[in-house]
Amino acid sequence: MFRLGDFNYHNKVVFLRVDLNSPMKDGKIISDARFRAVLPTIKYLLENGARVVVGTHQGKPYSEDYATTEEHARILSNLLNQHVEYVEDIFGRYAREKIQELKPGEIAMLENLRFSAEEVKNKPIEECEKTFFVKKLSKVIDYVVNDAFAAAHRSQPSLVGFARIKPMIMGFLMEREIEALMKAYYSKESPRVYVLGGAKVDDSLKVAENVLRRGFADVILTGGLVANVFTLAKGFDLGRKNIEFMKKKGLLELVKHAEKILDEFYPYVRTPVDFAIDYKGDREEIYLLSEKRELLNDYQIMDIGSRTIEKYRDIIMKAKVVVANGPMGVFEREEFALGTVEVFKAIAESEAFSVLGGGHSIASIQKYGIEGITHISTGGGAMLTFFAGEELPVLRALQISYEKFKEVKA
């Protein structure tokens, strides 16, 4: 795959695809983490005389965080201490004229790419390259730099459509992400521990099955709704209230998949021995083998319990590699953040090479000031897709582009 240092960018127009899709509250962006993550790539291109055109999406149609990129341009301007022109167009004549007006070392940001219907659905590269987005923009750009690792599991025109039309190059963030994930995935050092929590149960089951089947993991620690599904699969009763909640979320149909994994790999999958519930507004811990488990009929599980935390902590502290995705419980409420905080603290304190991903995981370590994890991944879904052993369309596009253009490398 092409790296940034492979080309000369002076006076060249570079379409830089990033993922600045950020959490919003009351119509305002509340985290600039993704902006900061791509600054090294942007600065490198500007310092090397590129004319930079930034493309990102924000939210999904009809969602509350679906917005223009005007604020994104302003935030980026402040971080770069340089004007970033907001272009209220994507690939129309106005956008193309603005791109052509850029001088070396100048930067503009296109409108939210998902304002174009072509950018909303996943399609094969062959279809993506036939879109108006690719056809029109390819007339005014020289190179494509892809630094959107968080969207690497998607196959949309701005992400993969230029692969056979223009040289497509990894940005610094993309390169760093791939290196860290591959190091963790293919590591021969044991114990290799996967901590799977949160609400992306289907994806987490695929990860667990893949890494266990390939012999890439020695133990799986579960939390959040992932733990609930595996606990049910082990034959424990989680009570009416929790089963109703899981049914509503469509999680009961995943229990069979969890049972299949346990049939083959039971000793390697650890589930909580106790849980914390919201008992009349307070944290109450329930040991699964005690009579108090009757409370699970009327109260919802909100976190893993203290006994589980200790067991998980002991395993993590001995690990050589830890991959974590998703919180252990409802960390947004302080009384139920204990499991998430203590498990993530153990990862940070361990001597393991550690990778952590997922929006909620990152939010929790930022909220509680946890430092020391080796690599914080910007991509939750992309990271899970990678560890599930599935192809990332953006990586395939980068490889295709390299094969097509390797002879023209400057």
From Swiss-Prot:
<dbReference type="GO" id="GO:0004618">
    <property type="term" value="F:phosphoglycerate kinase activity"/>
</dbReference>
<dbReference type="GO" id="GO:0043531">
    <property type="term" value="F:ADP binding"/>
</dbReference>
<keyword id="KW-0808">Transferase</keyword>
<protein>
    <recommendedName>
        <fullName>Phosphoglycerate kinase</fullName>
        <ecNumber>2.7.2.3</ecNumber>
    </recommendedName>
</protein>
<comment type="similarity">
    <text>Belongs to the phosphoglycerate kinase family.</text>
</comment>
<feature type="binding site">
    <location>
        <begin position="358"/>
        <end position="361"/>
    </location>
    <ligand>
        <name>ATP</name>
    </ligand>
</feature>
<keyword id="KW-0067">ATP-binding</keyword>
<keyword id="KW-0324">Glycolysis</keyword>
<dbReference type="GO" id="GO:0006094">
    <property type="term" value="P:gluconeogenesis"/>
</dbReference>
<feature type="binding site">
    <location>
        <position position="332"/>
    </location>
    <ligand>
        <name>ATP</name>
    </ligand>
</feature>
<dbReference type="GO" id="GO:0006096">
    <property type="term" value="P:glycolytic process"/>
</dbReference>
<dbReference type="InterPro" id="IPR015911">
    <property type="entry name" value="Phosphoglycerate_kinase_CS"/>
</dbReference>
<keyword id="KW-0963">Cytoplasm</keyword>
<comment type="subunit">
    <text>Homodimer.</text>
</comment>
<dbReference type="InterPro" id="IPR015824">
    <property type="entry name" value="Phosphoglycerate_kinase_N"/>
</dbReference>
<feature type="binding site">
    <location>
        <position position="34"/>
    </location>
    <ligand>
        <name>substrate</name>
    </ligand>
</feature>
<dbReference type="Pfam" id="PF00162">
    <property type="entry name" value="PGK"/>
</dbReference>
<feature type="binding site">
    <location>
        <begin position="57"/>
        <end position="60"/>
    </location>
    <ligand>
        <name>substrate</name>
    </ligand>
</feature>
<dbReference type="InterPro" id="IPR036043">
    <property type="entry name" value="Phosphoglycerate_kinase_sf"/>
</dbReference>
<dbReference type="GO" id="GO:0005524">
    <property type="term" value="F:ATP binding"/>
</dbReference>
<feature type="binding site">
    <location>
        <position position="154"/>
    </location>
    <ligand>
        <name>substrate</name>
    </ligand>
</feature>
<keyword id="KW-0547">Nucleotide-binding</keyword>
<feature type="binding site">
    <location>
        <begin position="19"/>
        <end position="21"/>
    </location>
    <ligand>
        <name>substrate</name>
    </ligand>
</feature>
<dbReference type="GO" id="GO:0005829">
    <property type="term" value="C:cytosol"/>
</dbReference>
<feature type="binding site">
    <location>
        <position position="114"/>
    </location>
    <ligand>
        <name>substrate</name>
    </ligand>
</feature>
<dbReference type="InterPro" id="IPR001576">
    <property type="entry name" value="Phosphoglycerate_kinase"/>
</dbReference>
<keyword id="KW-0418">Kinase</keyword>
<comment type="pathway">
    <text>Carbohydrate degradation; glycolysis; pyruvate from D-glyceraldehyde 3-phosphate: step 2/5.</text>
</comment>
